[in-house]
């Protein structure tokens, strides 16, 4: 089973274990700072750092263990990580005990309940799928309340009946002791369920029922444990009917009180994060501190702390995620996952370490084996009976296969162990027997059932969860079905899940969101804007994917066989050449002109023309770079994300251009009066420069002829103001490409960025690019005067990005026939 790659990985773990065993003897060799009567430069103060040092070492050991386990996928795919950690704990505990013969490190109830359990439960509540959880809340509550009471009562009474028969021998246990043991061993552990079921990947409904039961049965477990412990303290003869009634009332107080505390702190957390706009750096701290305070407050009031922190995470997640920044949300997500994973690792490892203590072990074969049998049998019976009742009212039935997995998934863990360790040995005489049996039950359920549940799920062909993001179409149809079902329930007068969900959504939108969410977050949550944003993302992805499918600028620049294979030549395009013009003219000798000087001039002419067209396209349509502002280090704020603001500006600018094109296509009007004036001015400039001696332009007029400021091309809506400064000193070369705009007769929306090649004014080819000196200009050859250079057969010009003049709404028309290019006149192509 063990992979050879794991061999070297165990060496650091064993070395750390030996170091931990030797740390206890370090205190004896410490020297006092002034033992020699003189000043000492360096002193050894182990006692000063003993506790935090040992804690850090154990965390390091647990983290290294996870790395070692995942070096081989074959091991972790068969054996659950929780089982591996328990085995590792047994090994390390054996090493520690062999060195000192004392159980130096054990899992104490204080460590578990106050430091290890809260991060795990908070993570489960904060990332809980709320709709799935509340949609199955009735089923979860039935299993959590009735099921836990059923398991506790039947297990305790059955063990007591066997004890009366004499099979267990002489034990100092009464009926209340058996019921107390049944109450702590009956609860399904959320830590164990999470550790095993996350690796199995069962379907969402089955997972949320088992996991929700493990979370919500805490209230029942705490109440039963406290009630029976009080009864044991009072004695069986002193218990009255009033005490039983108080126990029943205590259940409602503990469960509802813990839930109420969690909701109150969730409200407080959401309200605080609404006003943290200027202190983004401490937003994650509020999430963890206030959530932890809900746990401690419930524990202080003797309420259900697990329910408190669970509902705190469930109720605050929507508003907190909307209020805090993206960086803070990422910090909260990763920190919470890290704390939960680390706490879970330490819990299972310390369960193994705690078992290596001969003092706690008291063996009774009949008691241990019958406990394993009873918890398994009564768990299955309870699930079957409750499911039979639930299926009469559930729309989605729980099949027999689901019931088998639910019965087999009743795992026990560290909660049961921590509760049994809390027992007072003076009141419960057989405490060690209870502790030993609890450890056996935990190891059996986590290791044996954890090992076999995955093959069982595969053998039964249980429906697995789909790890994918639903498509936009699925979301829209799902939302439409929700409204339809809610309307049907409203018309029929039936109050169901859809009706309640719709009423809650309206209440949240009208009242809660306005109080707990900042205004900017309320606007960003608008569904229409979200759908519009997703449609535009899909639009952009489609354009990029189509561009990659048809080819790229790299093909034009580097016409090699390696790049040519990436271009799709399956769709024929009207063209006068079959290969790259650049490649043909640069690599092949003309059959007409054999003068090498003329050939070189022709090459330079075509190359310059390509560069001009490319530069023109990039300068006009691409986003202008912004000057980067260097922020100094600050402890109180993060460096702002420049890319996020730039992406938003690009998005807004592109959408304004597309909306303007949409107006012109629908109304049949020009896009912009300024664009028309600009075109007329370019026509006049073209007539003035129609006759150029030697193909050169006067250099003093270059700046005026080729520089058109960005404000001349503004659309009807002003662009969003920005704090950035444009980089100065760059090449300002932007020629007008606008003609008299007429409405396109074809269907679809004109996109300026993907406009047809006819929009390119041939006058730009008659001008000297600003990066060329007067001495570098050449007279184009005869062939270059007659024909404008073309790209490969499936491209129109050197602007391969503009594959279609339509948006993605009419993208299917991009492969249709296109008009033949009109060759430019020789007069318009003078350089």
From Swiss-Prot:
The chain crosses the membrane at residues 49-71, 80-99, 109-126, 130-165, 179-200, 203-234, 242-276, 279-301, 304-320, 328-356, 365-386, 400-423, 431-464. The modification Phosphoserine is found at residues 552, 560, 590, 605, 661, 716, 807, 810. Residues 822-831 have a biased composition (Polar residues). Residues 1-28 form the signal peptide. Residues 573-587 are annotated as: Interaction with EZR. A 1,2-diacyl-sn-glycero-3-phospho-(1D-myo-inositol) binds at residues 135, 138-139, 395, 494-495, 497. Residues 588-665 are annotated as: Interaction with NHERF4. One of its GO terms (biological process) is regulation of intracellular pH. Seems to switch between active and inactive modes in response to various stimuli. Activated directly or indirectly by membrane phosphatidylinositol (PIs). Regulated by a variety of auxiliary proteins, which facilitate the maturation, cell surface expression and function of the transporter. Inhibited specifically by the drug tenapanor. Residues 29-48, 100-108, 166-178, 235-241, 302-303, 357-364, 424-430 are extracellular. It is found in: Apical cell membrane; Cell membrane; Recycling endosome membrane; Early endosome membrane. Phosphorylated by PRKACA at Ser-552 and Ser-605, which inhibits activity. Phosphorylation of Ser-605 is essential for cAMP-mediated inhibition of SLC9A3. Phosphorylation at Ser-661 by SGK1 is associated with increased abundance at the cell membrane. Phosphorylation at Ser-716 by CSNK2A1 regulates SLC9A3 activity through the formation of multiple signaling complexes. Keywords: Antiport, Cell membrane, Endosome, Ion transport, Membrane, Phosphoprotein, Signal, Sodium, Sodium transport, Transmembrane, Transmembrane helix, Transport. It comes from the Eukaryota. InterPro entries: Cation/H_exchanger_CPA1, Cation/H_exchanger_TM, Na/H_exchanger_3/5, NaH_exchanger. Residues 808-831 are annotated as: Disordered. It is a multi-pass membrane protein. One of its GO terms (cellular component) is apical plasma membrane. Residues 589-693 are annotated as: Interaction with AHCYL1. Most abundant in colon and small intestine, followed by kidney and stomach. In kidney, expressed in proximal tubules and outer medulla (at protein level). Homodimer. Found in the forms of complex and dynamic macromolecular complexes. Binds NHERF1 and NHERF2. Interacts with NHERF4 and interactions decrease in response to elevated calcium ion levels. Interacts with PDZK1 (via C-terminal PDZ domain). Interacts with CHP1; this interaction increases trafficking and activity at the plasma membrane of SLC9A3. Interacts with CHP2 and SHANK2. Interacts with AHCYL1; the interaction is required for SLC9A3 activity. Interacts with EZR; interaction targets SLC9A3 to the apical membrane. The C-terminal intracellular domain is subject to extensive post-translational modifications and binding partner interactions which regulate transporter activity, scaffolding functions, downstream events and localization. Belongs to the monovalent cation:p,roton antiporter 1 (CPA1) transporter (TC 2.A.36) family. This is Sodium/hydrogen exchanger 3. It comes from Rattus norvegicus (Rat).
């Amino acid at each position: 089973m063990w992979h050879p790659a794991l061999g070297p990985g165990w060496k650091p773990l064993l070395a750390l274990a030996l170091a931990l065993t030797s740390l206890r003897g370090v205190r004896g060799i410490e020297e006092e700072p002034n033992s020699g009567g003189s000043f000492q430069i360096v002193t050894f103060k182990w006692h000063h750092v003993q506790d935090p040092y040992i804690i850090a070492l154990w965390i390091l050991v647990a983290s290294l263990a996870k790395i070692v386990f995942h070096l081989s996928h074959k091991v972790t795919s068969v054996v659950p990580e929780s089982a591996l950690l328990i085995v590792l704990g047994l090994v390390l505990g054996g090493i520690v005990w062999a060195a000192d013969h004392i159980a130096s490190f054990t899992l104490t109830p204080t460590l578990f309940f106050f430091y290890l359990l809260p991060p795990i439960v908070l993570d489960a509540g904060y990332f809980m799928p709320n709709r799935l959880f509340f949609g199955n809340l009735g089923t979860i509550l039935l299993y959590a309340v009735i099921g836990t009471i059923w398991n506790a009562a039947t297990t305790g009474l059955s063990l007591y009946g066997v004890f009366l028969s004499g099979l267990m021998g002489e034990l100092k246990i009464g009926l209340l002791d058996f019921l107390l043991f049944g109450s702590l061993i009956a609860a399904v552990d959320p830590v164990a369920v999470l550790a095993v079921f996350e690796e199995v990947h069962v379907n969402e409904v089955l997972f949320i029922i088992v996991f929700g039961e493990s979370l919500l049965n805490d209230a029942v477990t705490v109440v039963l444990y406290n009630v029976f412990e009080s009864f044991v303290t009072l004695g069986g003869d002193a218990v009255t009917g009033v005490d039983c009634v108080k126990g029943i009332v205590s259940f409602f107080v503990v469960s509802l009180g813990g839930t109420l505390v969690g909701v109150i702190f969730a409200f407080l957390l959401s309200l605080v994060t609404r006003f943290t706009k200027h202190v983004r750096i401490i937003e994650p701290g509020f999430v963890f501190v206030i959530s932890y305070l809900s746990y401690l407050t419930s524990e202080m009031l003797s309420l259900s702390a697990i329910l408190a922190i669970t509902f705190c995470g469930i109720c605050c997640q929507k508003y907190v995620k909307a209020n805090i920044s993206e960086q803070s949300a990422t910090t909260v997500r990763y920190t919470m996952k890290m704390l939960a994973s680390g706490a879970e690792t330490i819990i299972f490892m310390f369960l193994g370490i705690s078992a290596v203590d001969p003092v706690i072990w008291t063996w009774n074969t009949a008691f241990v084996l019958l406990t394993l049998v009873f918890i398994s049998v009564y768990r299955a019976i309870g699930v079957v009976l409750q499911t039979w009742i639930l299926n009469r009212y559930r729309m989605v039935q729980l099949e027999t296969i689901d019931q088998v997995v639910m019965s087999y998934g009743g795992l026990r863990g560290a909660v049961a162990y921590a509760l049994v360790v809390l027992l007072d040995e003076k009141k419960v005489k057989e405490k060690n027997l209870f502790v030993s049996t609890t450890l056996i039950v935990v190891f059996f359920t986590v290791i044996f059932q954890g090992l076999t549940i995955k093959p069982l799920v595969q053998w039964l062909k249980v429906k697995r969860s789909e790890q994918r993001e639903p498509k936009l179409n699925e979301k829209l149809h799902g939302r439409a079905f929700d409204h339809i079902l809610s309307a049907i329930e409203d018309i029929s007068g039936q109050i169901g899940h859809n009706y309640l969900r719709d009423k809650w959504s309206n209440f949240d939108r009208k009242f809660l969101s306005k109080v707990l969410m900042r205004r900017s977050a309320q606007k960003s949550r608008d569904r229409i804007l979200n759908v519009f944003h997703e449609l535009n993302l899909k639009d952009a992805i489609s354009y990029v994917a189509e561009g990659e499918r048809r080819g790229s600028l790299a093909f034009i620049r580097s016409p090699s066989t390696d790049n040519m294979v990436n271009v799709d030549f399956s769709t024929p395009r009207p063209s006068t050449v079959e290969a790259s013009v650049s490649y043909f003219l640069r690599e092949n000798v003309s059959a007409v002109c054999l003068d090498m000087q003329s050939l070189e001039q022709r090459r330079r002419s075509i190359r310059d023309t390509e560069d001009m067209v490319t530069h023109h396209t990039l300068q006009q349509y691409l986003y202008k770079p912004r000057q980067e502002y260097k922020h100094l280090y600050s402890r109180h704020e993060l460096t702002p994300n420049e890319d996020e603001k730039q992406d938003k500006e690009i998005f807004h600018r592109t959408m304004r251009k597309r909306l303007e094109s949409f107006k012109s296509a629908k109304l049949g009007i020009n896009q912009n009066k300024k664009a028309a004036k600009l075109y007329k001015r370019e026509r006049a400039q073209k007539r003035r420069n129609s006759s150029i001696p030697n193909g050169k332009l006067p250099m003093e007029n270059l700046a005026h002829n080729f520089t058109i400021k960005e404000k001349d091309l503004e659309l009807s809506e002003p662009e969003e103001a920005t704090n950035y400064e444009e980089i100065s000193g760059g090449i300002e070369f932007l020629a007008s490409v606008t003609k008299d705009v007429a409405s396109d007769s074809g269907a679809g929306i004109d996109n300026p960025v993907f406009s047809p090649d006819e929009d390119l004014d041939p006058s730009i080819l008659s001008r000297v690019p600003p990066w060329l000196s007067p001495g570098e200009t050449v007279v184009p050859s005869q062939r270059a005067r007659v024909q404008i250079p073309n790209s490969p057969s499936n491209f129109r010009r050197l602007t391969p990005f503009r594959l279609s003049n339509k948006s993605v709404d009419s993208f299917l028309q991009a492969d249709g026939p296109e008009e033949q290019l009109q060759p430019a006149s020789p007069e318009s192509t003078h350089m």
